[in-house]
């Protein structure tokens, strides 16, 4: 996602611990390899050293089964799978997210490579809107629309699928923490 380098080093310093945790979730779902994924898990769960050493391979298998494939995904990380009548990638929901991004001057830098409604992009958007909402009613309104009109409609079902299908304690803990994070996000929107 890009808004002329909206997350420069100075804004990272201004992020709350809540927002930093949101970016750690983004990084976990966007990680390209086991090492990066384990690093994200360690940020989310400092006590996860054991997972890094003992369960790293199992977590990787679990991650792939849940979110990547090659078999049918157990917990697809795309909003369109949960919201569209036909659970397809790059469907109406993806285009709706793209339009929402454009309406606030943002876009996904790898458009058509990874669908705009991938959980990692949506986590980043929620964090960006949250960070800016502290200073701008315009961003608070956008955050409210995004959370209540979009995330709330699919993220709980996604988390339930993770809980129901995960094989490792790391993934089950991730689902629990994502639930807590999302509950706090909704509280911030309502206030």
Regions inferred by a protein language model and the residue ranges of each:
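Surface/interface-facing alpha-helical segments and adjacent flexible terminal/loop regions used
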Residues: 1-191
